[in-house]
Amino acid sequence: MTTVRTRIAPSPTGDPHVGTAYIALFNYCFAKQHGGEFILRIEDTDQLRSTRESEQQIFDALRWLGIDWSEGPDVGGPHGPYRQSERGDIYQKYCQQLVDMGHAFPCFCTAEELDQMRAEQMARGETPRYDGRALLLSKEEVARRLAAGEPHVIRMKVPSEGVCVVPDMLRGDVEIPWDRMDMQVLMKTDGLPTYFLANVVDDHLMGITHVLRGEEWLPSAPKLILLYEYFGWEQPELCYMPLLRNPDKSKLSKRKNPTSVTFYERMGFMPEAMLNYLGRMGWSMPDEREKFSLQEMVDNFDLKRVSLGGPIFDIEKLSWLNGQWLRDLPVEEFAARVQKWAFNSEYMMKIAPHVQGRVETFSQVAPLAGFFFAGGVNPDAKLFESKKLSGDQVRQLMQLILWKLESLRQWEKDSITATIQAVVESLELKLRDAMPLMFAAITGQASSVSVLDAMEILGPDLTRFRLRQAIDLLGGVSKKENKEWEKLLGAIA
């Protein structure tokens, strides 16, 4: 009997997302329920954004939650390497195989040519897609241009008519017309594969039997299915899980909710409660009980109990469930967990240099730096009053700073400072106009340690969470303001 093998394959391009944890949990439970194996693979072909720091954060976040893997980049295994960036020769081999079989072809179109092609298609009211012009080139011309080293990508051929039947474990057969599919790029000009080629090759070579992924991938499933057909490989069972959503039913995003697993760890949530809550996202125990452990979920797991309605990720409900777990702890364990959470030596070493020179007794540390150990802060609204700025201007400035910080890739003091500086200059203000507001929002106080140092230490999710809290305290942002201010955002360098 074939061993069930599932996997999670996150990209190390930022903080570990709760959506990644959610999909990892369901893959883990499915594998363990069937006596199988759960694999961790790192999809790091985006060399500009992928970092080893983000990769380590993924490892740490999953292990904090209690989700472990039998094979992966850090533990090895018989199917490695487990980083896509280390599998380049493998992808080149299989991509060339597709070209040799006539299922893929070189495309020499420049970005400008592709832009013009799409613009013309849109002007005609057509769906923009690659028109296959490279297929009209003669073999001789293709060979000549390849020999000359002309930049090119490799695209896959797709049918122009008919439908692809996607067998989904949750929905049954889903029919998707082929005319919605583009001739997908499989290999980029830099020789690195795109998601589609790498995903299929890796899943096959690693013996993955079942793929549970987010439903946002369902529309592009025909491309993956076609690649399996081209290679002549057996396709894994497919399951497209419902997406996590904000309370307003929109797709879960960091603009409306903290989405980093690290944020919830820093906020003092229990990993057991976090897993419990993620397990209730579209799934329920046979007896409908709300509180259950990871092992209980594994023991009772059945995909038939997954609901397709968009599960709502609500921090208030998560907090309530976490409270249930906290209150059920023996008091000795509760005290031990509080101590472990609050007095993390690595975190304390980041804070200590900024506090030591400002206090005369240890008792002064908590009033000065207690905000480092809190989730949110409760600043007085009077702290946001400005002699130079109106209330509306204060909200606008803080909202623009929040938006710019959301797109910041490197969370370091210099880049944080440069981001705030860019916003204030775009509004023809000075940095000193913004800093008292940032002190109030981030520390809850009029003054403390350097707020820029504090933001770096607190991290992106906790910083953005407090900025959102401050903006809400001042009345929030209307839909009209949101639309107007987003136009300003686009003009900020």
From Swiss-Prot:
InterPro entries: aa-tRNA-synth_I_cd-bd, aa-tRNA-synth_I_codon-bd_sub2, aa-tRNA-synth_I_CS, aa_tRNA-synth_I_cd-bd_sf, Glu-tRNA-ligase_bac/mito, Glu/Gln-tRNA-synth, Glu/Gln-tRNA-synth_Ib_cat-dom, GluQ/Sye
ATP-binding as UniProt keyword: yes
Pfam families named among the record's database cross-references: Anticodon_2, tRNA-synt_1c
Subcellular location: Cytoplasm
Main location as per UniProt: cytoplasm
Molecular function terms from GO: ATP binding; glutamate-tRNA ligase activity; tRNA binding; zinc ion binding
Catalyzed reactions: tRNA(Glu) + L-glutamate + ATP = L-glutamyl-tRNA(Glu) + AMP + diphosphate
Motif residue range(s): 'KMSKS' region: 251-255
Gene Ontology cellular-component terms listed: cytosol
EC id: 6.1.1.17
Keyword field contains Lipid metabolism: no
Disulfide bonds: none
Position of sequence motif 'HIGH' region: 10-20
Binding site for ATP: K254
Keywords, sorted A to Z: Aminoacyl-tRNA synthetase, ATP-binding, Cytoplasm, Ligase, Nucleotide-binding, Protein biosynthesis
Functional summary from the UniProt entry: Catalyzes the attachment of glutamate to tRNA(Glu) in a two-step reaction: glutamate is first activated by ATP to form Glu-AMP and then transferred to the acceptor end of tRNA(Glu).
Subunit-level organization: Monomer.
Similarity annotation: Belongs to the class-I aminoacyl-tRNA synthetase family. Glutamate--tRNA ligase type 1 subfamily.
Name recorded for this polypeptide: Glutamate--tRNA ligase
Name of the encoding gene: gltX
